[in-house]
């Protein structure tokens, strides 16, 4: 199977956002857009200062395309690489404000009494910029928000209880476990249909 051109590329993606056939609303930007559409409000559970790197699903696909065609002289036989863009490192409050810009009238509420969020992180994507200059993220934040708004409106989304729906990964996993289709180790017990 392997020859001198065989390479392994581990793509460490920033947090995904955007519409997809398997939409997830437990991702920060997707959650904010869904909340704004259903309630006119975004509740930030932290003080809004934690950092999150994001990448749109279309840009993730572009990175996969790059990884499939990557040559060994571009990073070696085995490469682990952060995939995203340095300009897509945002504070949570900035993400909520972007949604409110696209959906005027959206109220943004932060929790000033929240303890510091230990999940705050900024990521360097310099290596990806160097190794994949023709596959850099193209979708901007406002376009990502608009894409989500349009997609959710097209599917007539309006479930105010979406956080307990199958569009949340943990809910979907618990449902599959409850039906006996997944083990506690998240392995299939039978082949899914």
Question: Can you name each region flagged by the protein language model?
Answer:
Residues 1-20, 30:
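Conserved beta-loop-beta element that borders a ligand/cofactor-binding pocket
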Residues 13, 21, 25-29, 53-57:
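The catalytic Tyr-centered alpha-helix of NAD(P)H-dependent dehydrogenases
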Residues 15-21, 49, 88:
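Active-site proximal helix/loop that lines the substrate pocket
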Residues 20-22, 29-30, 108, 124-125:
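Intrinsically disordered, low-complexity segments enriched in polar/charged residues with Gly/Pro
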Residues 37:
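Helix-to-beta-strand junctions that scaffold the AdoMet/dcAdoMet cofactor pocket
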Residues 40, 45-193:
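C-terminal substrate-binding subdomain of Rossmann-fold SDR/epimerase-dehydratase oxidoreductases
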């Amino acid at each position: 199977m392997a020859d001198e051109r065989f390479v392994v590329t581990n793509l460490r993606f920033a947090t995904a956002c955007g519409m997809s056939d398997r939409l997830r609303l437990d991702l920060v930007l997707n959650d904010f857009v869904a909340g704004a559409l259903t309630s006119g409000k975004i509740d930030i559970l932290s003080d809004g200062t934690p950092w999150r790197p994001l990448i749109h699903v279309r840009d993730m696909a572009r990175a996969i395309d790059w990884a499939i065609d990557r040559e060994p002289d571009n990073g070696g036989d085995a490469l682990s690489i952060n995939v995203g863009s340095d300009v897509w490192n945002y504070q949570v409050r900035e993400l909520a404000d972007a949604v409110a810009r696209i959906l005027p009238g959206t109220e943004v509420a932060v929790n000033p009494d929240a303890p510091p969020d230990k999940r705050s992180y900024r990521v360097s994507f310099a290596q990806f910029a160097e190794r994949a200059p023709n596959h850099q993220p193209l979708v901007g934040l406002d376009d990502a928000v608009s894409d989500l708004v349009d997609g959710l409106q097209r599917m007539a989304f309006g479930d105010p209880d979406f956080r307990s729906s199958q569009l949340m990964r943990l809910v979907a996993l618990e449902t599959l476990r409850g039906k006996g289709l997944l083990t506690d180790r998240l392995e299939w017990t039978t082949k899914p249909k």
